[in-house]
Amino acid sequence: IEIIALVSGSRETPVWCMVYDDLVYEHEADIFANQQKFVKPLTAYDTFIANVEAGNPEYLTIKSIIESYNLKITAKRTNGSLCAISTAEYIYRKYGYHVLDNTIALCIATWQGDPNSLVSNILKGVAKLLVAYGDRLDMNMFKEKIGMYSLREIIRNANARNNGSLGYAESMLAVYNKRMKYPLPISKLYNKRS
């Protein structure tokens, strides 16, 4: 209302409002999540939390996966938190429950919960590897080999290779394949499914 008064130069300008009566908390949160994204830009975090409050089963499932690793969902990167919530949603929708679960587990185990390991490109890169190679990707070997490298090295190599998460997946695969008798073929990363 203040913005309209400022623009029109009058506090007497009529403003169209929608008033809801007798809403339960969950329904109000659902209206907020779905209407506000068209009115003002909301962060992925705001939309996610509103959908959780609305009781949306998909968002509750994603939240339970994240919290099962003693992580909090936050808007900013901190220790013990995941702030790349839109990436978690993306992985869950595109690849499913188990890939999101394994992705988070692998990132935490490989880099001992470093908050920089739970950023968008790392999460998507690990998910791409899990989808492309499935059971051929030995998770214990991944943790051992990739964990020996700092995240800075992985990020530097990824930026030199390709844009986005594919570069991160390529960088991690190159480290994983070092000194392997039968390395995983990089061509599988470019499959349409991953």
Model-derived features: positions:
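A sequence-level detector for short glycine-anchored, His/Arg-bearing signature motifs
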Residues: 1-11
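Solvent-exposed functional surfaces
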Residues: 10-194
